[in-house]
């Protein structure tokens, strides 16, 4: 959220962090778990569909998927590099299962479910959405890298501020204002 605010309004990142923290805290305290749940639902919808809509605009700007493939080195398209082995994959799975399923943000939603069946259904749906969602930012990241490589997106901004600015910069350079607004509304 702070990154989006920083890019859109041109304010310092630290000021954006403070601003977002104050707004989110007030909203969550005044509305409780119900307001947070509603916000989660709207955010998931806007982020997933906003990013899906973003792909065609970004591909049009870069000149199509063939240009992405032609611009980037082959190794950028490998899902697993040589440093990842079965032990690493198992360790990551154990770490994610042990941390995300017992985190406060997840547990509070389990206990807020109407009944056990709703908790299981919600967890399964969230897992399915996360599996689908895992690939969308990857595609957008590859397109952004191609646009930085060919000079459409200035490399100095990414080098100065880091990769956290990749999605906002991609959006600002490739998408109409309405799509940017929907996407950023979901992220914020």
Label each PLM-derived region with a short phrase.
Residues 33-34, 143, 188:
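Gly/Ser/Thr-rich beta-alpha loop segments that engage phosphate groups in nucleotides
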Residues 1-16, 112, 169, 173:
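Helix-loop-helix connectors at the membrane interface of multi-pass transporters/channels
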Residues 4, 15, 22-26, 44, ...:
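N-terminal hydrophobic or amphipathic segments with adjacent small-residue motifs
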């Amino acid at each position: 959220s702070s990154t989006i605010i920083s890019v859109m309004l041109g304010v310092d990142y630290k000021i954006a962090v403070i601003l977002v923290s104050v707004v989110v805290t007030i909203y969550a305290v005044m509305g409780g778990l119900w307001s947070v749940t509603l916000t989660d639902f709207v955010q998931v919808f806007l982020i997933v569909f906003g990013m899906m809509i973003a792909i065609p605009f970004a591909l049009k700007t870069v000149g199509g998927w063939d240009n992405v493939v032609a611009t980037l080195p082959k190794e950028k398209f490998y899902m697993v590099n040589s440093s990842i082995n079965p032990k690493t994959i198992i360790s990551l799975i154990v770490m994610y299962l042990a941390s995300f399923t017992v985190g406060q943000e997840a547990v509070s939603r389990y206990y807020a479910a109407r009944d056990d069946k709703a908790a299981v259904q919600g967890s399964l749906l969230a897992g399915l959405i996360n599996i689908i969602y895992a690939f969308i930012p990857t595609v957008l990241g590859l397109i952004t890298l191609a646009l930085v490589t060919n000079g459409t997106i200035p490399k100095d901004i990414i080098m100065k501020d880091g990769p956290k600015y990749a999605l906002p910069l991609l959006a600002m350079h490739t998408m109409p204002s309405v799509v940017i607004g929907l996407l950023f509304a979901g992220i914020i």
